[in-house]
Curated annotation (Swiss-Prot):
Localization per Swiss-Prot or TrEMBL: Cytoplasm
Species this protein is from: Nocardia farcinica (strain IFM 10152)
Name of protein: Urease subunit beta
EC number(s) recorded for this UniProt protein: 3.5.1.5
Keywords associated with the record: Cytoplasm, Hydrolase
A molecular-function term among this protein's GO annotations: urease activity
Length: 108
């Protein structure tokens, strides 16, 4: 083995198996490209991205960990989102992070 080398299993590796998915159309209304990483709470992504933020609440991009999607200015593209897992708490991404996503009292 070489230091830093990846040894992957044979066959197809499924990302987020069995997870519910939603598809949303996103348009970059800004004048420069925007990249969104794999674990960003998608509704808190750059304000220049136009999409249904309410529908995306509690979700992240359905892409491999450590990767990102690039949105070019003026172009529309469809993305697949999956619900955030784990404790479903979001802090520090933007000025008004939602906190506990499943809090019955609403956002904190």
């Amino acid at each position: 083995m070489i230091p830093g080398e990846y040894l992957c299993a044979d066959g197809v590796i499924e990302i987020n198996p069995g997870r519910e998915r939603i598809a949303l159309d996103v348009v970059n209304t800004g004048d420069r490209p925007v990249q969104v990483g794999s674990h960003v709470h998608f509704p808190q992504a750059n304000a220049a991205l136009d999409f249904d933020r309410a529908a995306a609440h509690g979700c992240r991009l359905d892409i491999p960990a450590g990767t990102a999607v690039r949105f070019e200015p003026g172009l529309a593209q469809r993305v697949s989102l999956v619900p955030l897992a784990g404790t479903r708490e979001v802090y520090g991404i933007g000025p008004n992070p939602p906190g506990k996503l499943d809090d019955p009292e609403g956002e904190q």
